[in-house]
Amino acid sequence: MLYVPGSSFPPVPFPDAPTNLVRTEDLAGLDRGSPVATMYVSSTGGAIRRLIGSAHRHVISVRRDPQMAFGQPTEGIAEGPAMMRCATDPDIGFYQMQPFRLVVPYAGTTGSYIADLAYVTRDGSVWIREVKRSLADLGKPQYVAKLEAVNRLLTRLGWNFRPWTLNEIKGSAERQVNTGIIYYDRAARIDDLMPRFELIAAKIERTTFGDLIREIDPRNTCRARAAVHRLIMMGRVWADLDGLLEDWSEVRLRAPSTAVRDLPFA
């Protein structure tokens, strides 16, 4: 069993861990039945690394997204855009920067790996991302060997583990424009507009971006536009963000996602 100890809680079984995690025939030096690896998460939830101090080699920040329960620490020039991509993508239902530390055996030794990003898509797929400016930043062969060991372990959990480069994160020029505009409205107040939206969503599944704005609040389309941006971030409205979001752009209205899984770092 893979164990997930919090800093102030006793170890607990990792949810849904397949039993073959305790079979260590392919991992020399471990006793049969011992955990293959150990995952550490914050005992209070959210990021495991707080980025406190002044000795960091990269640009650092802590960002807030009202859709998520915890702050989002970023390190390096690619993690900030990755956080914004997750925040604005209507197909991503949950994400957390710096979510866990994994201690895993590889190449005759044991290494510690802190995940840059975890997210869950609307279909329930769990993705763990190694965020880099480019694949050239993966560095030395020993680090690549550690990533390969992490990949083998996370694959056993049914998770997906992939590098994510800055160019992939930013996407097309149109997506970059949409991401910036939508992210600006991440804290738009929509509570009083939700009953109106639910009535609209119960009647129609597809409409245009402009028509939805006018339906939500015809008297204040500026506020309604911000509300639709927030609904995109919530996944309640889907739009193709690789094309400029114009009044005639098609959008789909969706029910709240039920696919987001309970994760030890959520």
Task: Annotate each PLM feature.
Residues 1-266:
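Electrostatic, structured charged patches in enzyme active sites and in nucleic-acid/phosphate-binding
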